[in-house]
């Protein structure tokens, strides 16, 4: 009979399957959201009177949001699968930042169309659900 090894990980799996599924769904949805929002910005700049400075600001924020989203999804997936609190907490902080940028594109953009609202509301809902599941997963990892 072998003695238990020191430092061996427990056999209990603590990573959250619903969180992992939501992260995958969020990554896919964000790719579509990014392309649709980019096309909507091009449409708005051609059809409507859209100030150049506001267009530059919106494009900059959209690309910043894309970078932030990629980092957030990486940390969230890594933290969940490795059952590590620090990357998951970093993803939670980035989720708040990404939700604020989503709210900007949903509410405070220079020109908000119904298509922007239809695209932004599910993204904001995904961020909210992910934040709740990340808090639950962090609590499970800590205890």
From Swiss-Prot:
GO cellular component, one term: ciliary transition zone
Pfam families to which the protein is assigned, alphabetical: Transmemb_17
Alphabetical list of InterPro entries matching this protein: Uncharacterised_TM-17
Keyword hit for Transport: no
Segments traversing the membrane: 22-42, 47-67, 88-108, 122-142
Annotated keywords: Cell projection, Membrane, Transmembrane, Transmembrane helix
Biological process according to GO: non-motile cilium assembly
Primary residence: membrane
Compartment list: Membrane; Cell projection, Cilium
Mode of membrane association: Multi-pass membrane protein
The name this protein goes by in its record: Transmembrane protein 80
Organism: Bos taurus (Bovine)
Classification lineage: Eukaryota, Metazoa, Chordata, Craniata, Vertebrata
